[in-house]
């Protein structure tokens, strides 16, 4: 560069003025380059985190609930479902999805037909989950693990932790029966733990595969559950969404109203099952710990991120569902500040509904490879 500058000074004297102008003009690109260098530096800093966003359309290919429900098969597995079956405007078998009794019976039939679950029940007013969507989360998490190896992950060796297992125990049921995982389920609600334990005890397919732990502190998520010698391949969680009981009640009522409006639009009759009038019983319902916490979903997953750092060497992949899209970016920024090495955001769309989960690991690719080799 010095030689080029020296040669430029040897130009004829009559070009002295233009030379001065050119020198001024040359200064501008230098400032632009400086800005570009700053941007490049920032970009390089961001690239320290291996971030991938993945969009998935439709239910996972391994999900047993692709397409319409096979009511003949379901009724054969759970005959009590027959009394809840109705015809939709197209003349196809269906149920009244605003009737919690019908939804609960459908779940029993689905679990019996596709998951070899002989007994499943939940206490009144506890969350009754839509199984196809819940199952898809587990299938996508299994896909995340498969992405760590050539071929298939050794799923029979997987240890998983479900935060907020609930009375329904749905994620451990899917993980155990579909992949052979060993699951630990935690919950702050003792009644949920008792219900989940009852499900495990009364199903041969789950015996010895699911351990249930009560979280004794409402302010903790992983602390008190993950012991010093524990090593989990993955964690799962469906966090409480609402900020208060009132907010949760309004949200459930809004969902019910939307469902009824949609059914009326399609011409579905609603007087098929004997549901008490007055205060609605919602299949969208649930107990306090299932539906709300102070600060809502954003505050819960923020605590989850902070606490996960203390267990960075004991968990390969942390994951959580995130209902509100606006919570994704702040969560990502927080995880980057905490020093995670890899982040995945997996969007799952089923029709008009879009759900997502975020996964993060404090281990880089080589460390994750070593983890897997040592299993």
From Swiss-Prot:
Region Disordered, residue ranges: 1-39, 262-281
The SS bond pairs are none
Keywords from UniProt, A to Z, are: Cytoplasm, Methyltransferase, rRNA processing, S-adenosyl-L-methionine, Transferase
Q: Which GO terms describe its cellular component?
A: cytoplasm
Q: Which InterPro entries match?
A: METTL16/RlmF, rRNA_lsu_MeTfrase_F, SAM-dependent_MTases_sf
The top EC class is transferase
UniProt family annotation: Belongs to the methyltransferase superfamily. METTL16/RlmF family.
* HAMAP family, per the entry: 23SrRNA_methyltr_F (MF_01848)
**PANTHER family to which the protein is assigned, alphabetical:** RNA N6-ADENOSINE-METHYLTRANSFERASE METTL16, SAM-DEPENDENT METHYLTRANSFERASE
Q: What is this protein called?
A: Ribosomal RNA large subunit methyltransferase F
Please name the gene that encodes this protein: rlmF
